[in-house]
Amino acid sequence: MSLSRILRYNQRNNKTTASLTAEHAYSDNWAYSVSLGDPTSVGVNMAAKTGEALNKSYDSVFSSLPVADSVPRTDFTASSRDDENTDVQKLTTSWMEKIDTKMPENISKIDSNIISSPMVSKVEARFIVPKGRLRKNSTDFTSSFSNSLSLPKSYGKLIFFTSKKNSSSTKKNLANDISDNKHNNNSSNTIGHNIPVTTATATCDEIACTSTEHEYNVYEEERMFTTRVYSLEDSVSSLSTNPLDDTYSEAVQVNTRHIEDTESTAHIRKHSYTTSLSSIKRLFKITSFSNNNSNSCDHQESTVADDCAISSSLKETTSSPVSTGSFSLMIENEDSDRDQIIQALYSNIEASTDLVSRKYRDLDVVLGEGSGGKVKLVQRVLDNKVFALKEYRSKKKRESERKYIKNIISEYCIASTLKNPNICETLEILYEKGKIFQILEYCEYDLFSLVMSEKMHYEEICCLFKQLINGVKYLHDIGLSHRDLKLDNCVVTRRGILKLIDFGASSVFHYPLSSQMIEANGIVGSDPYLSPEVFYFNEYDPRALDVWSVGIIFFCMITRRFPWKYPKVKDVQFKAFCSGRGVSSFKDLVTRPATDDSNNYDNDGYEEGVIDMGPNFILHRLPEETHKIMRRILEVSPFRRITINGILQDGWIKEIETCQVVGAASPNEASLRIINKGNHIHTNIDQRYAHIGGLHQRT
């Protein structure tokens, strides 16, 4: 869902700086650079050539990094820079001048959102991270999540699903299962995530009541305890109960099972609950739906209306093996039950809505297009209100239909549950003529187009940046991480309210009633926004990835360019950023533990007058008041990186005046009021170019 852009080089201080402006983006003169929208799927891989030409001695994470004295200052003469006998390569961007910069002819079809992440087998050799050195103390992770069970009632439905008919037997079976597991060493601990393995689950009808406060019971052998689940409409508590603990070193249960030989183990990953948002689907159990279930739907709120329609649909349209069976049991015999599963899933989608063409009128406007599908502008026939319609891509040839449907429904289940002013509302999911559609709240602009317009003022950028932080905080507070934060996945209303979209790559790092931190794995998202640990760690804390991506987005908003193509030492720009840190290798840098001394963060790699390396390689392009917090956000070591709550404690962040939505938590516009701050106005641009789809058409 991104755009191919036109880039040019500007000579400044004897080094090449890549810039992106609307003038160049819409001209016919194309040049290649490491800049916003810089495509990586082109024929000539610039970063690969750079790694071969200038980084032959830095191909491994164990490679040494240049120190401050070995990196040239900006006052070096041209002759000294071109001296072939110099022992140390000059870490500037002048190397670009020597490499072919010709762009391919099919530039209009290149999409920066489809930045091909390297295959796991192609990633540099990973290394074992010593568990003991990565944490300041052995603080129990439970304390970090003591107040994090603030979840909406509909979120409970996604995880605890069974029929009301079997609720009494469920409680008995659950008590027996817990009793057995209590004396079994190979019970829930064998999974590694402290999630009980039981065929019985809590009754969803008991959870999804109309009150803002709900209770559900968990039975043990001799006693019962009650846990309260509060709606997200109430205040959401932070994951970190201590504001001083602003790094991820305290909360992360570091998993040291990293691979050293990627060639032999790249495709032999152990199954876990950390893969993606779609793993929640494993907890879904479709049991028999009786008349009691149908009646109970009438007492549930609109947030779970679709689930009621789904249950009714299964009862009326599916055969008994599907309506009385379980998806988890069908996995063992997927071939024989495949048709029934697909029929049930399709019936679920069709049951909640009418056909697309009956409810919505296509306005023939493409808002964006990417690897996951396309987004179009539609108008509801009932009231002429405008919405965004996401049309999912067709099933790939080698992709099972069951997996294809499951991933889409899993994304919808989570997205439709999120209720926050800085989250784009997901309304419904539809099925028509073999295609799946999702109806979303329409926002007038996307952040990428606003940045491309070059009309944004600094105060407006700061306002949107703080709203982005608030949106990410909301996700982290309920146990979700986005994992694909970028300009393309941020949309803005005409009143200046930023909203996050696209939760297909999201990861659940904390389940209700669990004290375990669930790490994520895999390389997802767009390379320029990824954090370095994603490439080098087998498993990582997804919250730290989100924080890093937030910093990259702010840098792009200020400079209208990417700092690097991807965060690997093969990239000259990133290697310069990692240099001068007082460590001998990149491995030591990315695994540095957290420290109690805040001065170690503020002065780390900071040296006056040196802008060719270290944090100043990035900071000298940003306003001075942002340097302190940006050093913490773009900390190479995830264990030293600041948390999203720590960002909000920064003095500069606190002083930012941000536009906000006040009123009821419901997305109903009639009950909401937007307060715009008087120190800035929000940019308005031509609607023809307000979205990436329009920019595509212009080029």
Swiss-Prot record:
Swiss-Prot/TrEMBL keywords: ATP-binding, Kinase, Nucleotide-binding, Pheromone response, Serine/threonine-protein kinase, Transferase
Main enzyme class: transferase
GO BP of this protein: negative regulation of conjugation with cellular fusion; negative regulation of transcription by RNA polymerase II; response to pheromone
Pfam (any one): Pkinase
Region (Disordered): 168-193
EC code: 2.7.11.1
Record field: compositional bias (Polar residues): 184-193
GO terms of molecular function: ATP binding; protein kinase activity; protein serine kinase activity; protein serine/threonine kinase activity
InterPro entries: Kinase-like_dom_sf, Prot_kinase_dom, Protein_kinase_ATP_BS, Ser/Thr_kinase_AS
Catalytic site positions: D484
Swiss-Prot/TrEMBL catalytic activity: L-seryl-[protein] + ATP = O-phospho-L-seryl-[protein] + ADP + H(+); L-threonyl-[protein] + ATP = O-phospho-L-threonyl-[protein] + ADP + H(+)
Domain Protein kinase, first and last residues per copy: 361-653
Purpose: Protein kinase that functions as a regulator in the pheromone-induced mating pathway downstream of mitogen-activated protein kinase (MAPK) FUS3. Diminishes transcriptional induction of genes in response to pheromone signaling.
Family: Belongs to the protein kinase superfamily. Ser/Thr protein kinase family.
Descriptive protein name: Serine/threonine-protein kinase PRR2
Naturally occurring in which organism (per UniProt): Saccharomyces cerevisiae (strain ATCC 204508 / S288c)
Gene of this entry: PRR2
